[in-house]
Regions:
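Gly/Ser/Thr-rich loops at beta-strand to alpha-helix junctions
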Residues: 1, 63, 105, 215, ...
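ATP-dependent carboxylate-amine ligase
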Residues: 1-25, 31-37, 52-56, 77, ...
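Phosphate-binding loop of NTP-binding sites
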Residues: 7-10, 31, 45-48, 60-210, ...
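Beta-strand->loop->alpha-helix junctions that form or flank phosphate-binding loops
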Residues: 16-19, 38-43, 82-87, 125-129, ...
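Short, polar loop motifs at secondary-structure junctions
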Residues: 20-23, 41-43, 60-63, 84, ...
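Glycine/charged-rich beta-loop-alpha catalytic/anionic-binding loops adjacent to active sites
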Residues: 95, 234, 257-267, 313-318
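C-terminal accessory "lid"/substrate-recognition subdomains
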Residues: 254, 273-274
Length: 453
């Protein structure tokens, strides 16, 4: 929604917005762009009769009973959903490159937008995070090309279709597919049905790029695909895309297409998952005319989005990272990448299970295993979590501490830290400001202060 606000303003509209709790980086971005942000949902923000907004864009987190929503309906103010606004006002006559999938959407769409930018295509984009190569999550662009992070979550309380069915991409990337969003989907099959609807919107002359090793994606493709296809493979192949890691942490790898080397990429990112994200972005860029060698060169200058294994700081030799991982697969993948980078050094995970799916307990039986390659973990159990986290963590093979107060988490984590440790904070929310609190606590933690004396 913050990105949509930027696009609407760029189209010449006066834009205001409201929310209950906006946190960085989006709150910072809106402030820097001069967009007024109103805290809360007092209907008075809609103005007086005769001065109502021309249009209200309602986010999918809003439901009936919200004071502003009820006022919009009662007053007859025109309204729409975010995806429909994008489809009606931004995407017409654009070559849409949509990046979808359970994991890696923000990273892959950021890579793709940067490749196009670096190669002179001047694309528009709308991305869930803030790509640091651009500093904003959205812009109109100066060409026909528009990159969009295509989410399967529903559009609004009045439109329960997945957001991405509104986008009509000509280039579609499906990164991967797992069960998620248990609050709106009954099972994986329900999610696959929505992806099938998305595939139906891609024109015959368009292209669908997908991972051949994903059984769930393959099943979805087999439901019907009328467009050209390109596939990514983990193993070496003579048809499609694959990569060969040249370093243990995957920060260097060679790219192959149809069995031919396209070049070697050495960059700041780590992990097999980022190799896969890069291949998808390179393949999508090739569809609009970018040579793979040029895309590889562009990615050497790529800076990952904020909150995607972002180094927040190093205090007394302790490195603190921020990561958006909120699904057991993403948690395990991130830890695997960090382990390859730091070797035998201690890795501490600080996790807030905040997504609706996590809070429901759907992933409680796989959460402990997802942290297997870490050395210890501290979990924050908020009041909104109604399953016994401590009981679920009995299956863990590493020490796991469950705490109910954020300040207690900060105190325990900072007290256990030693020089050379890596701490990874994982949450898809603001985590009650824990990140800054932890960095501050490490600065004055007794074990480091005593050493300094």
């Amino acid at each position: 929604m913050g990105g949509l606000a930027l696009l609407a303003r760029a189209k010449g509209h006066r834009v205001t917005g409201s929310d209950a709790n906006v946190y960085p980086p989006m709150s910072t971005q809106l402030e820097e762009q001069g967009i007024e942000l109103i805290q809360g949902f007092d209907p008075s923000q809609l103005g007086e009769a005769g001065c109502y907004p021309d249009l209200v864009v309602i986010g999918n987190a809003m439901s009936r009973g919200n004071l502003c929503v009820e006022a919009v309906l009662n007053l007859g103010i025109p309204y729409t959903s975010g995806p429909q606004f994008l489809a009606d006002h931004i995407l017409p006559e654009r070559w849409v490159l949509a990046v979808s999938g359970t994991h890696g959407k923000t990273s892959t769409s950021s890579m793709l937008a940067w490749i196009l930018e670096d190669c002179g295509y001047q694309p528009g984009f709308l991305i869930g995070g803030v790509p640091q190569n651009f500093g904003v999550s959205a812009r109109l662009g100066e060409s026909a090309f528009f990159v969009v992070e295509a989410d399967e979550y529903d559009s609004a309380f009045f439109d329960k279709r997945s957001k991405f069915v509104h986008y009509h991409p000509r280039t579609l990337v499906i990164n991967n597919l797992e069960f998620d969003h248990a609050d709106i989907f009954a099972d994986l099959a329900a999610i696959q049905k929505q992806f099938h609807h998305l595939i139906r919107t891609v024109p015959g002359q368009g292209k669908v790029i997908w991972p051949a090793d994903s059984h769930a994606v393959k099943q979805t493709i087999e439901m019907g695909c009328w467009s050209e296809q390109e596939t990514f493979h983990i193993a070496e192949v003579t048809k499609g895309w694959h990569a060969k890691a040249l370093s243990d942490d995957c920060h260097e790898f060679e790219v192959f297409f149809d069995g031919e080397s396209q070049g070697v990429l050495e960059w700041a990112l780590i992990g097999q998952h980022n190799i896969e994200n890069a291949l998808m972005a390179i393949a999508a860029a090739r569809h609009v005319g970018v040579k793979p060698s040029a895309a590889i060169a562009a990615l050497t200058r790529f800076v990952p989005p904020k909150r995607r294994l972002e180094l927040l700081g190093t205090v007394h030799g302790v490195s603190v990272y921020d990561d958006f991982a909120h699904h057991p697969t993403a948690i395990a993948t991130t830890i695997k990448g960090i382990r390859a980078k730091v070797g035998q050094s201690k890795i501490t995970i600080v996790l807030e299970p905040r997504s609706n799916t996590m809070k429901s307990g759907v992933h409680k039986d796989t959460l402990a295993h997802s942290m297997l390659q870490a050395d210890e973990a501290f979990l924050y159990q908020a009041d909104t979590i109604d399953w016994n986290m401590k009981e679920a963590m009995e299956a863990a093979v590493i020490p796991v501490t469950v705490l109910h107060q954020i300040d207690d988490v900060v105190a325990k984590v900072s007290a256990s830290a030693k020089a050379g440790d890596t701490i990874v904070v994982m949450s898809n929310g603001g985590f009650g400001g824990l990140h800054k609190k932890l960095l501050a606590a490490l600065e004055v933690s007794p074990q480091f202060v005593q050493q300094a004396d």
